[in-house]
């Protein structure tokens, strides 16, 4: 199973984001076993001119490969996460719960 992780990132540092992701990945592996594949949606090297729409387009592209999506804490506060959730709902991508 390929899982996309949707996570609020605005105003957070990379270390905090990575720590939360690692905890989620561990929980997913405990639930689904080692066969779970995590789609890495954390963009580390942003182009200079990248804006929010560009980032969202990359997230949607990655989400298109997913069998399921996990929405992390406070997802509803982030516009991008809300859009990703709407896409899951509209296109039948399973919303994974831990």
Tell where the protein language model's regions lie, with residue ranges.
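Conserved catalytic or regulatory cores that recognize and/or transform ribose-phosphate-containing ligands
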Residues: 1-98
């Amino acid at each position: 199973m390929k899982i996309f992780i949707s996570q609020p990132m605005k105003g957070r540092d990379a270390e905090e984001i990575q720590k939360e992701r690692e905890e989620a990945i561990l929980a997913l592996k405990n639930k689904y076993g080692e066969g779970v594949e995590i789609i890495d949606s954390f963009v580390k090297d942003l182009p200079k001119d990248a804006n929010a729409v560009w980032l969202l387009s990359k997230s949607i592209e990655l989400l298109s490969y997913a069998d399921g999506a996990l929405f992390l804490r406070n997802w509803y506060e982030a516009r991008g996460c809300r859009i990703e959730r709407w896409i899951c709902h509209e296109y039948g991508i399973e919303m994974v719960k831990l």
